[in-house]
A protein has these predicted regions:
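Sec-dependent bacterial lipoprotein signal peptides
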Residues: 1-16
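Beta-strand elements of well-folded, non-transmembrane domains
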Residues: 50, 115, 240-242, 250-256, ...
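Structural boundary/hinge residues at secondary-structure and domain interfaces
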Residues: 18-149, 153, 192-227, 263-287, ...
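Intrinsically disordered, low-complexity segments enriched in Gly and acidic/Ser/Thr residues
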Residues: 227-292
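A short, solvent-exposed beta-edge/loop patch
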Residues: 44, 149-184, 243, 289-307
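Generic beta-strand structural signal
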Residues: 96, 104-105, 141, 160-162, ...
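Short, surface-exposed beta-strand/loop micro-motifs that present aromatic residues
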Residues: 32, 92-98, 155-162, 232-238
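Short, solvent-exposed coil/turn segments at beta-strand boundaries
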Residues: 39, 117, 143, 160-167, ...
């Protein structure tokens, strides 16, 4: 479907907002990571043209649309009203802000989308679209920019342009004002800058982010105290242009924890390999390689097109499309029957 990438680019708008924070006045033009506040806990960067038509991306969006028909309907209307096509977008950054409150969850999401965009046209089509459902679009000055609020029922979306070809969107007003402000950005955050440097930033999709303390503590329990603490951060890169290549890194507190988590993960992978035989996915699981590298646990997998199709078939509830191959001797913890 032509509007799938528009949906992908705008998933962040579904996340509830959080408390407003102070912001400096509007800064110069901002785009990409330069628009992401230093307070962000995680970032996902997407090179849109390079993920178009990737089978796994296509499948993931299909599943999302099936499970969220309301989302599909809303973004179909956006596609029809605003003539958004996948080729409209060139580069998208999703940034997740800090979570507040005692309940588990994530912070507000900021979407920074760059492409063939025209502010007046986007504002006009959003106004027409929300107006059809009794909603409103209001515009208010924000320094030398305009902050738009689209409201329909109990749904609110804010957006503004960081520069002529870059729109910033969020369900949280403070996320927009902070992004446009002259305050520090994600590249000024030493931890996030360090973790982002560990990801393959040349990949079509890459991400880096801090791990929630509750998740870290949970992993200690899951491993029966084999690790002293869960990972401080996760980094990932994904290339689905030909087959699928995934590289995941868990940044541990020390090499001993990385080695302990390697042992635990290999044990879990061996059990998964056995279960995967029932779905003819032993060959796929066998491509997963696990190894500790100093304080980082690395998990890598490279699948060819046939293996990707096999995985998609299994995800759809069918058996694998190809015969499972037994894992070779000496594989990195992915041995299975």
């Amino acid at each position: 479907m032509k509007y799938k990438l528009a949906i992908l680019c705008s998933l962040g708008l579904l996340v509830a907002g959080c408390k407003k924070s102070k912001s400096s006045g509007p800064s110069a033009e901002v785009t990409g990571l330069a628009a992401v506040p230093a307070s962000a806990e995680a970032i996902v960067v997407i090179d849109v043209p390079r993920v178009l038509d990737a089978p796994l991306v296509d499948h993931a969006i299909e599943v999302l649309l099936q499970r969220e028909p309301d989302l599909a309907e809303r973004w179909q209307k956006l596609h029809e009203s605003c003539k958004l096509e996948p080729k409209t977008f060139q580069h998208v950054v999703l940034a997740i802000g800090p979570h507040t409150g005692p309940q588990p969850g994530t912070g507000p999401v900021l979407v920074v989308a760059t492409g063939k965009l025209v502010e007046t046209e986007l504002a006009a089509c959003v106004r027409a679209m929300v107006g059809q459902g009794g909603g409103t679009l209001t515009a208010s000055p924000l320094g030398n920019r305009t902050l738009y609020q689209a409201k329909q029922g109990n749904r609110i979306m804010y957006f503004a342009f960081g520069r002529a070809d870059t729109v910033l969107m969020s369900a949280n007003e403070a996320s927009i004002t902070e992004a446009l402000g002259a305050g520090k950005k994600i590249t000024d955050n030493p931890d996030m800058a360090k973790w982002a440097a560990l990801a393959d930033q040349k990949a079509p999709i890459w991400a880096a982010g801090r791990v929630d303390e509750r998740v870290r503590a949970g992993l200690v329990k899951t491993t029966n105290n084999a690790v002293s603490a869960g990972p401080q951060a996760l980094v990932v890169s994904i290339d689905a242009t030909k087959g699928l290549k995934i590289a995941l890194g868990a940044v541990m507190a020390n090499p001993a924890d990385a080695k302990a988590l390697e042992s635990f993960a290999k044990t879990q992978l061996a059990a998964l390999a056995m279960a995967a035989q029932a779905k003819s996915l032993g060959r796929v699981v066998n491509e997963v390689k696990i190894a500790a590298d100093a304080s980082i646990l690395r998990i890598d997998a490279t699948l060819d097109s046939d293996e990707v199709n096999q995985l998609i078939s299994a995800l759809d509830g069918g058996g694998g499309s190809a015969q499972s191959a037994p894992p070779p001797a000496g594989s990195n913890g992915s041995a299975g029957p």
